[in-house]
Structures are given as C-alpha cells and as structure tokens.
C-alpha cells in the first residue's frame, strides 16, 4: 500500500479573537467559508496533505483561541510547532498592535528556529481597512517574516501562504529531508508526531469537531 504522506508536522494559527483564524483554516482544508463562526474554545485542529517539491506533507494545523482566558491552555501547543501564522485583521488596528505581544509569546514558548509568517486577514474588507499593507510589510520585515494579506472570503493568498510556510519548514529541516530522499521506504515525522498523539494535553476543547 502506497504511503499516504512522507513527512508530518504541525502549523499553528495565533492572533486575537475574531481575526479570522478559523475561517483561514476552513478555507484551506475544506475550501469552505462561513461568515460567522462560534469562537474557538481552547484549541481545534484540522489535517491536510499537500505536495511540495515532490514530498507529500501531512500538516496538522492548530487553531488557537485568542481570548486571554485560554492563553495558559494554548501556549502549551507552541512548543511542538514547526511553523506559526501570526494573524491580524486589516480592519482592526488593535489586532495589528497586538502582534508584538504574540511575537513575544512565540519567542518565549515556541522552539528555536520555528518558522513564522505574518498574515493580514480580511483583505476583502477594504472599505473598513485600518491597517495599511505597507504597515504589515514593515512589521514583517522588522521580525524577519514573510507577509501575506489574505481573505478567506475570496480565497486570496490562502493556498499561497500555507504552501509557503510548509516550504519554509521543509527548508529548515533540510537534513531530515535529505535523509528521507535517500531512504524513500522510511517515513519521517518531522514533528515526531503521530496523528493519534494530537489529542489536546489538557482540558482544552472546542465547539467544533476536534479530539477532546
């Protein structure tokens, strides 16, 4: 039986509540968009397999609650992430200003060398824009991150941003990747993570489908 994937790792979506993290996740994994979602409680996740440079990559994508009361629960997931999206809403200056706080959390709790991309979401809401594209580009430059403006509503840059973060993680794990290519019969889990081990490590749960 052919392998379903070659490598397996985790991506994390973080940012203020209401910036559209769940919408980004659903658009990428299921190609669905719903204008309203119940706020994530704790942590939720979805899986998707994509191919990058001939490598089948199984991605476990975690959607974290942005509310302060869930921060103790969600921060435990930073430690095993290989890639992180830091998301703000272009129609919310407040969510943009809070990116500095989220970066600080990543620096404190995520592993060294974790790959990061800055996302300015809800790009379809141009008439409500409070954060200029140039502001996002400048902030990303300051932190050494790639930057995308996205829209889950119109599907703008959804595939592109997720594919790019996947590429960055693969590049960061080049040695393991070369080992995979030399031993094509062996499966390599970059996150040392089996799917059944993805169960939340605490009382986290979600109003949406998840292991809890």
From Swiss-Prot:
Renumbered ranges of motif Switch 2: 63-80
Residues that coordinate or bind Mg(2+): 22, 40, 63
Binding of GTP, residues: 17-23, 35, 39-40, 66, 121-122, 124, 151-152
Motif range (Switch 1): 31-45
Keyword Disulfide bond in record: no
Pfam families: Ras (PF00071)
Coiled-coil intervals, chain numbering: none
Name of protein: Ras-related protein Rab-15
């Amino acid at each position: 039986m052919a392998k379903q994937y070659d490598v397996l790792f985790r991506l994390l979506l973080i940012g203020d509540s209401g910036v559209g993290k769940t919408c980004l996740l659903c658009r990428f994994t299921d190609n669905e968009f719903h204008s309203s979602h119940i706020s994530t409680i704790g942590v939720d996740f979805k899986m998707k397999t994509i191919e990058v440079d001939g490598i089948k990559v199984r991605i476990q994508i975690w959607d974290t609650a942005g509310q302060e009361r869930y921060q103790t629960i969600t921060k435990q997931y930073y430690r095993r992430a290989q890639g992180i999206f830091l998301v703000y809403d272009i129609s919310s200056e407040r969510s943009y200003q809070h990116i500095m706080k989220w970066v600080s959390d990543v620096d404190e709790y995520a592993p060294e060398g974790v790959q990061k991309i800055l996302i300015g979401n809800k790009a379809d809401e141009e008439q409500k824009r409070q954060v200029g594209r140039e502001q996002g580009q400048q902030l990303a430059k300051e932190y050494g991150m790639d930057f995308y403006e996205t829209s889950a509503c119109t599907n703008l840059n959804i595939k592109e941003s997720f594919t790019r973060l996947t590429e960055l993680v693969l590049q960061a794990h080049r040695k393991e990747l070369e080992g995979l290519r030399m031993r094509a019969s062996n499966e390599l889990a970059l996150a040392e993570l089996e799917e059944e081990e993805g169960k939340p490590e605490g009382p986290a749960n979600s109003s949406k489908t998840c292991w809890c």
